[in-house]
Amino acid sequence: MYHSYADIPDPWDRLRWCRYGLDLLQKEVAAMVGMEEWLYRDLESGIFHRSFTPELADKLAALYGIPVEDILDDYTLFLHRGGVDFLRRY
């Protein structure tokens, strides 16, 4: 489907690409970063939940050796960067 990581437009496909590159199962990744398997499975399907915390995003990025911005959609990246707190101040 994709020839390189740079060709992948969607965060959820980047997660899958990285996991395949490390030859890991979804349940293995979930256990390594301390999340439920269903949550990781949903992330790879493009479903982001409130329980996908900035800390979990940072752990996944560290595991895969990529910038956290590469695995977050725009809304989740906004939340990760403290966007809600920023808006509350105004």
Protein language model features and the residues they cover:
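A short, Lys/Arg-rich alpha-helix, primarily the initiator
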Residues: 1-21
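Conserved hydrophobic/aromatic packing and binding residues within compact polymer-binding modules
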Residues: 15, 29-30, 40-43
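Short, basic-rich loop-to-helix N-cap that marks the start of a DNA-contacting helix
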Residues: 23, 47-62
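Short coil turns linking two alpha-helices in DNA-binding domains
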Residues: 25, 36-38, 67
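The alpha-helix within a helix-turn-helix
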Residues: 19, 30, 61
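Recognition helix of helix-turn-helix/homeodomain-like DNA-binding domains
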Residues: 34-51
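DNA major-groove recognition helix of helix-turn-helix
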Residues: 44, 56, 75
